[in-house]
Amino acid sequence: MLVNIIFLDYERHDFTQQVKNHNFSNAGYDFSFTQVEMKGISRALNYGISRSKAFDAIVTMANDILMPDSWLLRMVEAALNIPNTGMCGIHCVEGINPLQTINGIQIHPQDASFGNVLIPMAAIEKIGYFNEAYDPYGMQDSDYAFRLKMTGHINYYLHDLRSEHIGHDVGQDTPYRKMKDEGLSKCDYLWARETQKYHDNNDYTIFLNEYP
């Protein structure tokens, strides 16, 4: 499995080098990477996807999450053994569901997997790109996970692994935090609007013109 990491590095670079040094050295599996400094999480991920067509999977990676040893090896093993993998993640934030075993792989199935996730290109080819309506910051990961689930994919965390979010900035008076708060304030409205649109049209795909 050929993997391309889409490394999101917009605006705040406090932990960029630390995260790259750590996550790139302990992955346990070969990879390529595309570093994107672009406003809007969906827009940045979509640009990365457009540069990943020769790969079998992507990994979405934030510049403030540290991954455990052999994280990519474990992700690849899971995706190869669970053919309908949507988002394969390593638990970082939010809750985690009970353990299940699928094809010998221990996982925690989720509605959405947050943090850094592996997404097979086969899943991307089925549902397309991230929804840029949530940009610059919002529920783009939940939206993508919802569309994956509705098209027969399974989103999950790997068992017995934990990643660490080192970029906590809640309450900070910075332009970056203000951008996030503004995006989050629109989440409920956008989520209701976009998911209703998918249901009404019975269409969970988003295909965009290729990025230059």
Over which residues does each language-model region extend?
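Aromatic-glycine-rich donor-binding/catalytic loop that engages nucleotide-sugar donors
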Residues: 119-138, 147-153
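Short beta-strand-to-loop acidic/aromatic patch adjacent to the donor-nucleotide binding site
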Residues: 55-66
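A recurrent flexible, glycine/aromatic-enriched loop bordering the glycosyltransferase active site
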Residues: 101-121
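Glycine-rich, basic loop-to-helix element that forms the pyrophosphate-binding segment
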Residues: 36-52
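C-terminal catalytic/acceptor-binding lobe
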Residues: 137-212
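Conserved donor NDP-sugar-binding/catalytic core segment of glycosyltransferases
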Residues: 70-102
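Short, acidic, metal-binding catalytic loop of nucleotide-sugar glycosyltransferases
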Residues: 19-29
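N-proximal low-complexity "stem/linker" segments adjacent to membrane-targeting elements
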Residues: 1-18
